[in-house]
Amino acid sequence: MPIQWRVIKWSVVTWLLVLVACRGLDGAGGTGADRLPVGTLVVLHRDLVIPPDQAGVFVPGTQIGDRYRYDATCRLEVRTVNATFRTVVADRFTVVRVEQNWERFTRQESGLRRVRMDYDGPALLRFATALYLHSDRQPDVFRLVCSYLQDSAQNPRYLTTAEIRTVLTPVVTLEGGR
């Protein structure tokens, strides 16, 4: 009986260590410590017009410097698509959820691939931070997605909170959070 208990105890400890290690990875690449907290206010300072047959509009913001080959962008999105122009009026939205994800946007083929000496070159990756929003006045507005493309060979990462604030300026500001 004591031997079985010892085995069970060590297997439980091992699983706990694995779970703790996986939880620590949540903060890698700007996802944990730099994540905007739920409850942050997103303040839209002027009206934005969504074109017909579109579910969102790009926020005309500020460039964040020359670190990126491609400019970061933010897009305010709505739940429904209309056949006519529609306006999202200046308002205050509350962040109710934050998600970060990345996807392979394109793959750059290397010259050695043709002779089967290499699989492919670096990929172009899209890193996105989605702020899910709530407003009693405009319930159709549901998220603000800030993203950028980066070469996988250049140590890609998510936009920091400071970079998101810069990209949104002067049309949108974030109140609260870091």
Region annotations inferred by a language model:
Residues 23-102:
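N-terminal secretory signal peptides
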Residues 1-7:
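N-terminal secretory signal peptides that target proteins for export/translocation
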Residues 89-178:
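Mature extracytoplasmic/lumenal regions of exported proteins
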